[in-house]
């Protein structure tokens, strides 16, 4: 049976297989490059009711390529449509209803979905020509299809996992927000940037004097992290030397800091009202019993607050009303977790279940605040 879709007849046949949904994988021009810098080479589609997947070439040297817009119209007929990484998919097709299978897995299993390596042919091409921008255009379609089939066979069992509580928040809102943020990147002075950060290959994620990153939503807590090509925006040193590698837009760097973000979230959940002034300063007044707070006392108050947020309430302050409320909140949350087997984050709706290992009240509080 054919597996390469190249003719109108084959496209129509494949469309008739879409009524039960399917799984899609994008073959970009080079897996090493940031998705913003790639083109769509092929699409792998595996109808749910089929015992094999199909490759649709869009800009491959070996195939009778199909117009990308026609492929897009075809893909919209598959419902439900699963994919390994929805955010990556959006760089190629605006399929907002797609279901991120890696996200389904991570929210059910509190771990990252592991994907098998490619075949020996693909590995040889990447070891030999990994910097070539359109590398996947040169790899035989049969080998690309073989890799996609291998990946699908390893993950198909997880399509039956239940859609977890809070999934829509991450699959739709969070995915789209970080998809947009990623495309902005950070302005750089190219040579100082390369000298200081030493990326494996700067071409993998730089364009127009901007460096790009990729956000990961597949952590156990679902707190986003970012990294691409050895660059982590959250770990850039705050030194003047390192700042010289970055170029501000419109001549200015603007720094924002949400005052007591996690503390304010917690106070909202326990019903403790905070005023508009600094949250840390308000609580410092309680700790030290006075209105005027020194810089040293403010720093001490921040340390106390961070400890309390993650369930470590100082003994000398545990009788203050706010800490009584926090302790009650922790106790009730832990009781529900032990008795019901789960608790849900009030912001996102994500559930944390007893599948999490080595859980304790302080760790559970940490997960809830992330």
Regions found by a protein language model. Name each.
Residues 12-14:
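RNase H-like, metal-dependent ribonuclease domains
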Residues 98, 172-173, 188-193:
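Non-catalytic nucleic-acid-binding/docking modules located in mid-to-C-terminal regions
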Residues 2-4, 18-19, 29-41, 45-50, ...:
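Acidic, glycine-rich two-metal-ion catalytic cores of nucleic acid-processing enzymes
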Residues 90-165, 174-184, 229-360:
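Helical catalytic core of nucleic-acid polymerases
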Residues 2-8, 18-24, 28-162, 260:
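Conserved DEDDh/DEDDy metal-dependent 3′-5′ exonuclease domain
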């Amino acid at each position: 049976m054919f597996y390469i879709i190249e003719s109108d007849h084959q496209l129509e046949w494949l469309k008739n297989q879409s009524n039960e949904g399917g799984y899609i994988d994008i073959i970009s021009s080079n897996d090493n490059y940031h998705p913003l810098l790639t083109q769509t080479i092929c699409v792998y589609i595996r109808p749910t009711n089929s015992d094999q997947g199909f490759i649709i070439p869009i800009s491959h040297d070996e195939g009778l390529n199909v117009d990308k817009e026609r492929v897009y119209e075809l893909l919209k007929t598959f419902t439900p449509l699963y994919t390994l990484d929805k955010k990556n998919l959006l760089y190629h097709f605006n399929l907002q209803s797609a279901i991120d299978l890696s996200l389904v897995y991570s929210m059910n299993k509190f771990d990252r979905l592991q994907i098998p390596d490619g075949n020996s042919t693909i590995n040889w091409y990447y070891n030999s020509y990994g910097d070539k921008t359109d590398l996947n255009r040169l790899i035989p379609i049969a080998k690309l299809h073989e890799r996609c089939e291998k990946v699908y066979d390893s993950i198909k069992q997880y399509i039956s996992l239940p859609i977890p509580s809070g999934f829509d928040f991450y699959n739709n809102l969070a995915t789209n927000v970080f998809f947009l943020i990623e495309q902005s990147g950070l302005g750089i002075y190219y040579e100082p940037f390369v000298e200081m950060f030493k990326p494996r290959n700067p071409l993998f994620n730089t364009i127009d004097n901007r460096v790009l990153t990729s956000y990961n939503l597949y952590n156990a807590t679902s707190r986003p992290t970012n990294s691409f090509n050895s660059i982590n925006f959250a770990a850039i040193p705050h030194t003047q030397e390192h700042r010289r590698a970055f170029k501000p837009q419109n001549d200015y760097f603007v720094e924002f800091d949400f005052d007591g973000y996690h503390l304010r979230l917690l106070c909202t959940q326990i019903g403790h009202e905070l005023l508009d002034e600094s949250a840390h300063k308000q609580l410092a007044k309680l700790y030290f019993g006075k209105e005027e707070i020194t810089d040293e006392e403010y720093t001490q108050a921040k340390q106390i607050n961070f400890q309390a947020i993650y369930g470590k309430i100082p003994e000398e302050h545990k009788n203050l009303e706010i800490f009584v409320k926090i302790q009650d909140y922790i106790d009730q949350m832990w009781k529900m977790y032990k008795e019901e087997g789960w608790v849900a984050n009030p912001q996102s709706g994500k559930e944390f279940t007893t599948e999490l290992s080595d859980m304790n009240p302080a760790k559970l509080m940490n997960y809830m605040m992330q």
